[in-house]
Amino acid sequence: MIKVITYGTYDLLHYGHIKLLERAKALGDYLIVGVTADDFDKSRGKINVQQSLMQRIDAVRATGIADEIIIEEYEGQKIDDIQRLGIDIFTVGSDWRGKFDYLNEYCKVVYLDRTEGISSSEIRSERKKIKLGIVGEQFLAEKVAHECNYVNGIEVSGVYTTNTDIKIGKKFDTFDELLNCSDALYIISHPTLHFKQIKKAIDLKKHVLCEAPIALSLEESRKLHQLADEKGCILMDALKTAYSTAYSRMILLAKGGKIGKIISIDATATSLRDINLISQNNVSHTWNSICAWGPTSMLPIFQILGTDYCKKLIISKLLNDDFDIFTKVEFIYDDSVATLKVGKGVKSEGELLISGTKGYIYVPAPWWKTDYFEIRYENPNDNKRYFYQLDGEGIRYELVAFIDAIQSKHHPTYISRDLSNAICNVIEDFYARKDFFELK
């Protein structure tokens, strides 16, 4: 019996896939089809896959062509599969010609001509593209525009900004003009403008991805989420850390008891990028420390320990009434504590520590760009290290989640509304000087 194996993602299974599978089957007596796992696709930079692994497996199975279906989960698995399953022929589309010649050492390699003019990428791209308008003065806007190039189903309609140094395609003179030419907005304007801009966009039934905080008070945050529901719009916090694979896995391991009961969390995030503006007291258009770094630092605290803390203390070193160069927030829960330290006028090691009764999780600086973390125990021999590919600082994964939410009309679960509201509540208390102590 001649055994044949082939691999693919098989997203949005189409005629071209089926013809290739039929030709593969004709090469032998028994066809094994390897379907790529979601995480494996992400590690290869394939982030636009529309269907889940099980949906793709079911689609391949429904063709009746495959005799056996396996899952491809890691780099180098093809050699393992060929040897383990006794494969005689490995086959793949001709667009990969030469790529798998090294497998000739283990079996015969056959490249099959693909059906011209048909591909999953083209099918995904042909779906109605979301026109994304970008609003704001920070250079992160340029990164977002660049990352849009890697995400199917999205195109940048233009930018509304007062920063003449930002170079993003078409520039609009007014916020309203950008709104009229966009289906959705990415907002990174000054936090004092967020509520007004988000409300105006949602009133016109535009979807919004906004750099947290989405508002400067709990009441405003609740109003925006309620309005989004009423208008059938997606409103998402843009916290890129939440969408990275490594960070998500780290949170799951922490909550799953890998380090025992969690007693303490310490998150630090600082930057001196704006130190020249701060030294000149020219910060009217600059994000302060609590808004720039607070939401990111609150993310793991609230995701792991929840938002129902007993009390908190905000300790700040102020440049003026609205601008903190350093802030420390201490949260006290019934059975745990957490501390965040953020600063734009102070420098510290930007690490994340999660302490439990059995061990601790260590995420090195810059922890908010999570691609690596360690679980450490009393016995170093038990320590575990985890690494996951992170492309585009997590921005492209954030954009994919946003587009998926718009297309599915379902709010994603990366950042809950309770968490979004809790972030705004802490920032409101900072401005109101509630639970507050000022350093001289």
Spans of model-derived segments:
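Nucleotidyltransferase catalytic core that binds NTPs
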Residues: 1-130
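Hydrophobic residues in well-ordered beta-strands that form the structural core
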Residues: 33, 210-211, 235-237, 363
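N-terminal Rossmann-like dinucleotide-binding module
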Residues: 129-168, 403
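C-terminal helix-rich "cap/oligomerization" subdomain common to oxidoreductases
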Residues: 134-135, 160, 184-189, 401-440
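Beta-loop-alpha module in the N-terminal Rossmann-like domain of NAD(P)-dependent dehydrogenases
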Residues: 170-225
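Rossmann-fold dehydrogenase core element
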Residues: 223-240, 261-265
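Predominantly a Rossmann-like dinucleotide-binding segment in NAD(P)-dependent oxidoreductases
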Residues: 241-311
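Contiguous beta-strand/loop segments that form the cofactor/metal-binding neighborhood of enzyme cores
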Residues: 292-369, 399-410
